[in-house]
Design a protein with these regions (language model features):
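Conserved glycine-rich beta-strand-loop-beta hairpin in the small C-terminal domain of fold type I
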Residues: 54, 229-240, 251-260
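Walker B catalytic acidic pair
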Residues: 139-140
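Short secondary-structure boundary/capping segments
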Residues: 17, 156-157, 201, 253-255
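Conserved core segment of the aminotransferase class I/II
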Residues: 160-230
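Conserved core of the PLP fold type I
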Residues: 1-133, 144-161, 165, 232
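Inter-domain helical "communication" segments and dimerization helices
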Residues: 217-221, 244, 248-255
Length: 260
């Protein structure tokens, strides 16, 4: 609904530093539906790069859409940019804020190199036949649950060339039964989506959309996330304390405790 898109746009502006007009937000019943729409939007003739290790079903979902997938290894700072270049992929699906399952936070250098990779041929990236050039699918998985420090700014907030598709879902924060996800499209991709895919009916219940819009508008969602984050931090602190007080203290090392 327009009201939910506006609520999400306001949330992204306030908490993720993203300036995205509501009309460039697409809502769907879960992230997997969005992955399928991205393939239809960008085209099946592309190679999609996915992180390895990564979300186990992602390659299968893209493969079911008849696109070729390239599995790209991770370095300490995120996706291996050299391997990405060598793969011939024109779409990179990444989780910069909190990579699953490793928990890696993409480094500033890797973010810069990834954005530079995507900008190659950006000046001629669109045609009457559809979008060309390279794109990044930024899956902002788990970004709300960073335990300490400043939130990790999304790639989308510094994307000046219109190469980043931003994805997020409410499933992690509101429960697996709450199947609402969304993506924020760059301006020209949003126009392509409206032209070629705008006929799709939204599969999310209007009642659920209205309820979520009000939940966000009234500040309940942010307070809910803060409570979850506080509870998770208490559980984490308790686990770490017990391990450090146990006979395992010399055998176990913790890292990335701020990542969620």
């Amino acid at each position: 609904s327009p009201r939910l898109r506006q609520a999400i746009a306001s949330y992204l502006r306030e908490y993720r530093g993203m300036e995205v007009p509501a009309e460039r937000i697409v809502i769907a019943a879960g992230s997997q539906t969005l992955y399928q729409l991205i393939v239809q939007l960008l085209g099946r003739e592309r190679t999609f790069a996915t992180e390895c290790p990564g979300y186990p079903l992602l390659g299968r979902i893209y493969g079911a859409q008849n696109v070729h997938c390239a599995s790209i290894p991770l370095s300490a700072g995120g996706i291996d940019i050299a391997a990405l270049r060598e793969s011939g992929a024109s779409v990179a699906h990444v989780m910069p804020a909190h990579q699953f399952p490793t928990g890696i936070v993409m480094s500033a250098a890797c973010r810069r190199d990834l954005l530079n990779w995507s900008r190659t041929d950006a000046a001629r990236a669109f045609s009457a036949a559809g979008p060309r050039g390279r794109f990044i699918v930024e899956d902002d998985y788990d970004a709300e649950f960073r335990m300490s420090g400043r939130p990790i700014a999304p790639l989308s907030s510094v994307d000046v060339a219109g190469r980043v598709i931003y994805l997020n879902s409410f499933t992690k924060s509101l429960g697996a039964a709450f199947r609402i996800a969304y993506m924020a499209l760059p301006e020209e991709l949003a126009a392509q989506f409206e032209l070629n895919l705008g006929f799709y009916s939204n599969t999310v219940s209007p009642l659920e959309q209205l309820a979520l819009a009000r939940f966000i508008e009234q500040g309940h969602y942010e307070r809910h996330v803060n409570r979850l984050r506080t509870h998770a931090k208490q559980l984490q602190d308790g686990l770490v304390r017990r391990v450090r007080e146990s006979s395992l203290a010399e055998e176990v090392a913790f890292e990335g405790l701020d990542r969620g």
